[in-house]
């Protein structure tokens, strides 16, 4: 219908936006936000840590249990049920129970179904509501904000410039054929050209399947590790297209007072039902009729 709905970072502006599009859901929205922040506090420390080792033995097992107990010692029964609901429930059912406004549901959907090759009514998708609350930021409960001017390649160039200032040698057009292993330790890599690079530490930014099953001799890995890596599901839920435009696109309904940063990121979002239908279409090998499109003007 041409309506542009904003998700503001400050409560007064967000409250005003909600009173415009979903007057009956305003109080429930902020109650839900506080609940999410409280639940995210239990999980946030695990973002930058290895998950608990469920197979640990002896003193190591005691240490794992102590660390987990310390994190959850203040948890209430309501919070336990809330965490279980978010870890196992569906985003669509959660939103349908909580809110009446379709526009509010679509606003939350646009920010909460990340990296999931599935529809919003599939089990586990409610976890997306906690995604932005697990990486610090506003009161250490808000994740990333903003995007890179010049596109994501600007990050690569900044890393390269900073590394070269520190004396790092960067080799391009040098595909790796194999990670060298000796006595159970990575000792470097061999390039497709046949050149070998020795190293005390080898870091791979390739996906786990290619790293462990493509670049490492599988005889060097435990059978359980090979099986676990092979079973990682990595179906991509999205495609990316870059356009070079002669001018900024005009969005129907975009208020004239929006600043450039506010106009630089917007989403063409389907309804919950259409988002579920999109996934079903992809499973049949079809392109959905109502695409979900994130638009970023990075320049």
At which residue positions do the language-model features occur?
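Dinucleotide-binding Rossmann-like beta1-alpha1 core, especially the glycine-rich loop
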Residues: 1-48, 81
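Secondary-structure boundary/capping signal
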Residues: 26, 103-104, 167, 220
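Short N-terminal secondary-structure initiator segments
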Residues: 2-16, 54-87, 239-274
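Active-site/ligand-binding neighborhood in enzyme catalytic cores
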Residues: 37-166
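Short intrinsically disordered, low-complexity coil segments enriched in acidic
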Residues: 1-7, 154-157, 165-166, 199, ...
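Catalytic cores of large soluble enzymes that bind and process phosphate-bearing ligands
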Residues: 6, 10, 24, 28-31, ...
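Mid-domain catalytic core of redox enzymes
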Residues: 147-149, 168, 174-299
